[in-house]
């Protein structure tokens, strides 16, 4: 049960990017692991600090083959195994530190996101909230090639996606890209958790996320990536 007199609950109660109305403050760390496991293979999860102080809110959606998990949690340590998929982390508050492939990375809300290839990693967060979603590197590589206008070859795109990358969210092109992602994620959210993941609207929304993720990774190609994504007419969501 949440401790109502703890000021951290105010941070935990801030809106999640999806599934906010379904998420309640809880100390059930297995629930958080279950939601994150829809995007990356969680090996273990533990609170940073005394176990009795851990609390979180989390929710999820599935669009096509993509899992999206939104969460806000007190400081947490997460171990993730190797995967055939890659993942992107975008924070709304707080920061997260990553150790993978012998290197250290820092993701911070509003300034730096994180691209995670399918290698194992360790993540340690402050009191933080944000979104993680998974992608197929083979499919994402095709979107990178398309956004490049033919200057990036498929083998080079796949090589890029085998490397961890801090995403510069302060690049001039990012405002439009992040707005587009926000629109897509909100649309997925409004369709609710009971919508069939392989329904045409959700698959189209997944394709939009792929296109805009290519722009996150190659911001100089963002204009072409943005042009490749066209919002669906509202009637197609019915």
Please report, for each region that a protein language model flagged, where it lies by residue:
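N-terminal low-complexity or simple alpha-helical regulatory segments
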Residues: 1-92
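Aromatic- and glycine-enriched beta-alpha-beta binding-site module
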Residues: 87, 92-98, 104
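Short acidic (Asp/Glu) patches
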Residues: 71-75, 92-94, 110, 115-118
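Alpha-helical bundle regulatory/interaction domains
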Residues: 2-24, 34-40, 47, 98-238
């Amino acid at each position: 049960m949440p401790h109502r007199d703890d000021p951290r609950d105010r941070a935990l109660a801030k809106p999640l990017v999806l599934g906010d109305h379904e998420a309640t403050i809880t100390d059930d760390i297995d629930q958080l692991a279950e939601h994150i496991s829809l995007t990356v293979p969680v090996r273990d999860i533990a609170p940073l600090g005394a176990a009795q102080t851990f609390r979180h809110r989390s929710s999820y959606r599935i669009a096509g083959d993509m899992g999206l998990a939104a969460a806000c949690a007190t400081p947490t340590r997460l171990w993730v195994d190797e995967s055939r998929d890659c993942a992107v982390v975008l924070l709304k508050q707080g920061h997260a530190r990553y150790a993978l492939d012998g290197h250290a990375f820092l993701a911070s809300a509003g300034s730096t996101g994180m691209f995670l290839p399918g290698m194992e990693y360790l993540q340690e967060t402050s009191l933080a909230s944000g979104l993680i979603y998974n992608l197929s590197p083979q499919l994402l590589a095709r979107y990178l090639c398309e956004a490049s206008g033919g200057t990036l070859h498929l083998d080079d795109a796949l090589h890029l996606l085998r490397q961890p990358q801090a995403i510069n969210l302060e690049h001039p092109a990012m405002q439009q890209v992040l707005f587009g992602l926000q629109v897509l994620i909100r649309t997925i959210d409004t369709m609710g958790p009971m919508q069939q993941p392989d329904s045409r609207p959700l698959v189209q929304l997944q394709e939009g996320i792929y296109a805009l993720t290519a722009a996150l990774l190659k911001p100089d190609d963002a204009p072409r990536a943005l042009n490749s994504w066209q919002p669906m007419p509202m009637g197609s969501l019915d």
